[in-house]
Design a protein with these regions (language model features):
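Glycine-rich, positively charged N-terminal anion/phosphate-binding segment
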Residues: 2-8, 23-100
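Non-catalytic, substrate/partner-engaging modules appended to enzymatic cores
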Residues: 14-15
Length: 101
């Protein structure tokens, strides 16, 4: 990785030219950590199902788990109702403080 900002997403600087693609069922916490150690400049979570967040299903917490060195961290939501996506984001943003959604 480099200390130079290659590009920005909003206010988030991406300092490197490798980005871990979001892959549901693959990009769990250990895999994101390994990719970060190998030079990934941005980590993306697995899909976070909005209904899991709204019903407090434990499955989403496993998919959301991360270490501070995984930052910048992007959340990706799975949902088909704008209101549910917004409600899930309002629950997770204070807790996770994602860099990108």
């Amino acid at each position: 990785m480099t200390e130079e900002t290659i590009f920005k997403i909003g206010d988030t600087s991406i300092k490197g030219d490798l980005i871990l693609a979001p892959m549901d069922g693959v990009t769990d916490m250990p895999f994101r950590g390994l990719c970060r150690q190998l030079g990934s400049a941005l980590s993306v979570t697995e899909f976070i199902n909005t209904l899991d967040v709204l019903t407090d299903h434990p499955r989403y917490k496993k998919r959301l788990a991360f270490e501070p060195f995984h930052r910048p961290l992007s959340l990706q939501f799975l949902g088909d109702e704008a209101e549910q996506i917004l409600a899930a984001a309002e629950i997770l943003i204070p807790e996770v403080q994602p860099d990108i959604i």
